[in-house]
Amino acid sequence: MKVKICGITDMETAKRACEYGADALGFVFAESKRKITPGLAKEIIQELPANVLKIGVFVNESVEVIQKITGNCGLTHVQLHGGEDNHQIRRLNIPSIKSLGVTSESDMKNAQGYETDYILFDSPKEKFHGGNGKTFPWELLAHMPKELREKTILAGGLNTLNIEEAIRTVRPYMVDVSSGVETEGKKDVEKIKQFIIKAKECSK
């Protein structure tokens, strides 16, 4: 099971997450309490292992700005949380992830229309897109087609207490956590470690 730790804002957390086995780190460039500047993201990314995916999170940002930040920071993928369509995705010409809030099984069908490398299924948006700590009914994704499952990233309120059930139900390619590994709004490296251990054990 692949694991993504999202909302990285400091070097120490990023390095520790990689040491514990994170496969991807997320850097939020949209409005969020976890927003990071491109300058700091670049400093952190330069120190990370080459095999770890560096994913930039954007919401309804222009193609030009996304391309500039991606190039300057050394991002490997972009994660799109707004109303982006396939025309914009093709113009980006960057490996991409489309985030969709799940409210019904029909969201699986909608997901198959996006020309992205991965689909991130999340709880429906609130004030901020993602990172709100809320789960959604995972059984809505229990019967997805194999070709979609192989590119599915599961997010939305995951933590050490529910990750095993979430993986058993959805069987995604990757799981994504942010608030579920925080204490009082800050990333907690011990929670990150335990989350990664539990997620990886589920796929053995």
UniProtKB/Swiss-Prot annotation:
Name the pathway. Answer: Amino-acid biosynthesis; L-tryptophan biosynthesis; L-tryptophan from chorismate: step 3/5
Q: Which GO terms describe its molecular function?
A: phosphoribosylanthranilate isomerase activity
Could you say which EC number(s) this protein's record lists?
5.3.1.24
- Which GO BP terms, alphabetically? L-tryptophan biosynthetic process
Q: Which UniProt keywords apply?
A: Amino-acid biosynthesis, Aromatic amino acid biosynthesis, Isomerase, Tryptophan biosynthesis
Keyword Amino-acid biosynthesis recorded: yes
Top-level taxon in the UniProt lineage:
Bacteria
Q: Which CDD domains match?
A: PRAI
Q: Name one Pfam family in it.
A: PRAI
Chemical reaction(s) catalysed: N-(5-phospho-beta-D-ribosyl)anthranilate = 1-(2-carboxyphenylamino)-1-deoxy-D-ribulose 5-phosphate
> Is 4Fe-4S among this UniProt entry's keywords?
no
Query: What protein family is recorded?
Result: Belongs to the TrpF family.
Supply the HAMAP family for this chain: PRAI (MF_00135)
Q: Which PANTHER family match?
A: N-(5'-PHOSPHORIBOSYL)ANTHRANILATE ISOMERASE (PTHR42894:SF1)
Q: What is this protein called?
A: N-(5'-phosphoribosyl)anthranilate isomerase
Q: Which organism is it from?
A: Bacillus anthracis
Q: What is the lineage of its organism?
A: Bacteria, Bacillati, Bacillota, Bacilli, Bacillales
